[in-house]
Amino acid sequence: TLDMVPRQFVYISSLSIFGPIHEDNYAPISERDTAMPNTAYGVSKLKSEHYLQSLNDFPTVIFRPTGVYGPRERDYFLMAKSIKQHIDFAPGFKRQDLTFIYVRDLVQAVYLAIEHGVRQRAYFVSDGNVYSSRTFSDLIQKELGNPWVIHIKCPLFILKVVSLLAEFSARCLGKVSTLNADKYKIMKQRNWQCDISPLVEELGYRPEYPLD
């Protein structure tokens, strides 16, 4: 038992707990879907959710954000750096639907949950829009004022080999690689749409920072 129960406990999980899903029809991931993570990161987040949900009467509210960007975010910074150098790499040839959330909109969702005293609830969080990988890179190019960029679609098997080699090399050097087996699985995933209507309808969430 927990002797000191907080008034409310907010846990930031991840959309990654659902793994690759609805990649045939690109339907938004919803709370009706079954979480089946395919990465160590997703598994750890799901286990944390299950633990919190197993605590009787523990006042938990869970957020499952899509890709979060903002100050000091590293992964998207590396992509922007590549585009600044006139190269844009897109994983695979099949359609990929991306979603994002600016950190301030995520904070808005958290504050709304606190204000409403939400308990035993889980919400998906995004800015409500869906972007193609090309649209995403074009927006970065425009923001950087880069006059031209070479767009390269990298076959997934090549990306997988490069990811595994980068991870192995980093381990040999006692370092952590940004590009690794887990990251490959995330980049490979085709559908990142999610249903934020419960967050909008129940808490009045209104995203203020679209990617563009």
Sequence positions of predicted segments:
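Mid/C-terminal beta-alpha module of Rossmann-like enzyme folds, strongest
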Residues: 113-178
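Alpha-helical membrane-targeting segments
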Residues: 78-100, 149-191
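Conserved Rossmann-fold NAD(P)-dependent oxidoreductase catalytic core, especially the SDR/UDP-sugar
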Residues: 1-40, 61
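Flexible, glycine-rich beta-alpha linker
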Residues: 18, 61-78
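C-terminal amphipathic/interface module of NAD(P)-dependent oxidoreductases
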Residues: 131, 139, 175-212
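Glycine-rich Rossmann NAD(P)(H)-binding loop
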Residues: 91-96, 123-131, 141, 153-154, ...
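Substrate-positioning beta->alpha
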Residues: 43, 47, 73-78, 92-114, ...
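Active-site Tyr-X1-5-Lys
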Residues: 36-61
